[in-house]
Amino acid sequence: MRYITAGESHGPQLTTIIEGVPAGLSLVADDINEELARRQKGYGRGRRMQIETDQVQILSGVRHGETLGSPIALVVENRDFAHWTKIMGAEPLTEQEEKEMKRKVTKPRPGHADLNGAIKYGHRDMRNVLERSSARETTVRVAAGAVAKKVLAELGIKVAGHVIEIGGVQAKEITYSSIEELKSITEASPVRCLDDEAGNQMMKAIDDAKANGDSIGGIVEVIVEGMPIGVGSYVHYDRKLDAKLAAAIMSINAFKGVEIGIGFEAAHRPGSEVHDEILWNEEHGYTRRTNNAGGLEGGMTTGMPIVVRGVMKPIPTLYKPLQSVDIDTKEPFTASIERSDSCAVPAASVVAEAVVAWELATALIEQFGLDRMELIRENIEKHNEYARGF
């Protein structure tokens, strides 16, 4: 599977075209809208989320609630475009209209793509950069991820994300009996955190940052249960599943780090306390005593839950902006302010779920069949039976 997205933050709509989704997948707009609504929630979101009520239109590739195997086109309207029709319109402006246009951006914001993108593409108005580099684009990435989640769900694979740190407030490790329980707890939390006490402290940290005109980041974790053993490859570097997952997490706006399993903690432990001992029983076949590897070894799944974490930096759009330089006058200035969140970590956990789900669904389809869900399901069942008795 693959997809491409198009659209600007304040343009008329966001679009994604998805290719390679097998035929026979049950899919309706509400499957996607549910994920879009989850992305819009979360303590610390800005005023933009009060304007947009994201709803998807499925334009192709689905008929009567079932995928056809042909490309799927999804569109999400930007309601805020009504206030930006002249500024973000596709048609040329008159000389007078250009003079009257007030939202030209010549002051790059530290931490954003503004300056680098303007230099790369030769844009004197950096709105041409910030409109596309905006995290608003993750709307349709979540839409694509919702399709991937449906693929996984029909194959018995469950995905959940949650927040484990915001602004230096760390959640305690909370035990849960199932992915369903994890989901029910996090969906009820304004910051998508399992630890209620830490969640309250996180909200206070967000409030404090907002009051100071600042922003804060954090860490999200995605857990996936039900993946078969041996998905991915050790044969070539670019087929390693852990490498693909790491790239997917790092592709999310403002993410600056990723780890799988115990991650960087492995540097502090001896090998005897890192590697997961292998067990076998007649009912389940091969399993592990621990899961320090986070469900991945040698670029392939081990059959244990996949555990991936990502670090999100504080959003660089601040209400007490940092110093910058005007690209026209070269004079020092405080950076332009765009409407923004004070913390988007809870929403980012939903985006992280989406990109992880996409990579796993893609890997399964490549390995177990391309054309129809029935074939993929049968092949996975045969593979699991083979692996248990290996």
Swiss-Prot record:
The UniProt family comment states: Belongs to the chorismate synthase family.
**What EC number(s) is this enzyme filed under?**
4.2.3.5
Gene name per UniProt: aroC1
Q: What is this protein called?
A: Chorismate synthase 1
Q: What is the lineage of its organism?
A: Bacteria, Bacillati, Bacillota, Bacilli, Bacillales
Cofactor list: FMNH2
Q: How is the cofactor bound?
A: Reduced FMN (FMNH(2)).
Task: Name a Pfam family for this protein.
Answer: Chorismate_synt
Say which species the protein is native to. Bacillus cereus (strain ATCC 14579 / DSM 31 / CCUG 7414 / JCM 2152 / NBRC 15305 / NCIMB 9373 / NCTC 2599 / NRRL B-3711)
Q: How does it assemble?
A: Homotetramer.
- Entry-linked HAMAP family: Chorismate_synth
Pathway-wise, it operates in: Metabolic intermediate biosynthesis; chorismate biosynthesis; chorismate from D-erythrose 4-phosphate and phosphoenolpyruvate: step 7/7
Single annotated GO MF: FMN binding
Q: Could you state one GO biological process linked to this protein?
A: aromatic amino acid family biosynthetic process
- Per UniProt, FMN binds at R132, S133, S134, N253, A254, G298, K313, P314, I315, P316, T317, R339
UniProt cross-references to PANTHER family, sorted A to Z:
CHORISMATE SYNTHASE (PTHR21085:SF0)
Q: Where does NADP(+) bind?
A: R39, R45
GO cellular component annotations of the record: cytosol
Q: What does this protein do?
A: This reaction introduces a second double bond into the aromatic ring system.
Q: Which domain of life is it from?
A: Bacteria
Catalytic activity of the protein:
5-O-(1-carboxyvinyl)-3-phosphoshikimate = chorismate + phosphate
